[in-house]
């Protein structure tokens, strides 16, 4: 039902401030789920089981991090038919993020710009929300995305990632290390060759210790930017192979603006998502696939606004895909549309 109603609701939602509309929509989904109306929320998605990183995914279409930063809407979002859900980014301590306004629509380009800045309630509150979710209890695949606090010096970023990894590990199907948001100062420096090598080495050591402690191996994946040249992609590929990382998510938002030049809000600071990042994301996926082969699975995200776009990511070398901005423009029916495209 919601699939049919979304085109009617979108003009109302787009008349609101983007961040207000975001919270309004999530709260309405949560209310509908609490009232037992889950069957009216999303379309049925036929099972397409596949095993990636040792995890059994019921279908290959997931929710990207950023939509539910605090893990407060997991069960309602799970009713939309996703094969997996990723929540966060969470940091060790609560932080407000950047001042509002910090999210902007570019409808002519089916795009968003955000400079949220990892606003979240901190890892302890995050874990309480995750523990309360029935999705996790029922065996749903749940990725937990971790980052660093804005006031943590980049030289000590590893401390924040270690703290979050240790806290979320028992509750995660997999953990994503986000080093690619453009909205935390200097964060993307961690994609540099020496910085990345040091970070991944430390996190892999902690992962093995936690696996021994909890008697359960939780994959750790890296989320990277689309704004990388061939040498940078090669360096990242080498690091992923050298440290035997479990997976990589390609990609985060872009800081490039050529595709939206002249549009209202195009010059706002922040990360650009949606249609304009589609080709850049797919380029990174294709390049990584050539470097990694089958050794490191790729999760493709960026500019998926139709089933054929999800198919592009898989054809370029991704094993799974994630959605975010496409949901804003197309509504929840996009989940089933992408799943159908990947079943063909």
Swiss-Prot record:
Pathway linked to the protein: Pyrimidine metabolism; UMP biosynthesis via de novo pathway; orotate from (S)-dihydroorotate (quinone route): step 1/1
Q: What does UniProt give as GO cellular component?
A: cytoplasm; plasma membrane
The record ties this protein, via CDD domains, to:
DHOD_2_like
The record ties this protein, via InterPro entries, to: Aldolase_TIM, DHO_dehydrogenase, Dihydroorotate_DH_1_2, Dihydroorotate_DH_2, Dihydroorotate_DH_cat, Dihydroorotate_DH_CS
Q: Which class of enzymes does this protein belong to?
A: oxidoreductase
Q: What is its main location?
A: membrane
**What's the catalysed reaction?**
(S)-dihydroorotate + a quinone = orotate + a quinol
The record's subcellular location field reads: Cell membrane
Q: Which cofactor does it need?
A: FMN
Q: Which residues form the active site?
A: 181 (nucleophile)
Instruction: Write down the PROSITE patterns for this protein, in alphabetical order.
Output: DHODEHASE_1
Q: Which domain of life is it from?
A: Bacteria
Report the co-factor binding details: Binds 1 FMN per subunit.
Q: Which family does it belong to?
A: Belongs to the dihydroorotate dehydrogenase family. Type 2 subfamily.
Protein's job: Catalyzes the conversion of dihydroorotate to orotate with quinone as electron acceptor.
- NCBIfam families in the cross-refs: PRK05286.1-1, PRK05286.1-2, PRK05286.1-4, PRK05286.2-5, pyrD_sub2
Instruction: From the Swiss-Prot or TrEMBL record, give the protein name.
Output: Dihydroorotate dehydrogenase (quinone)
Which taxonomic lineage is given here? Bacteria, Pseudomonadati, Pseudomonadota, Betaproteobacteria, Burkholderiales
Q: Which gene encodes it?
A: pyrD
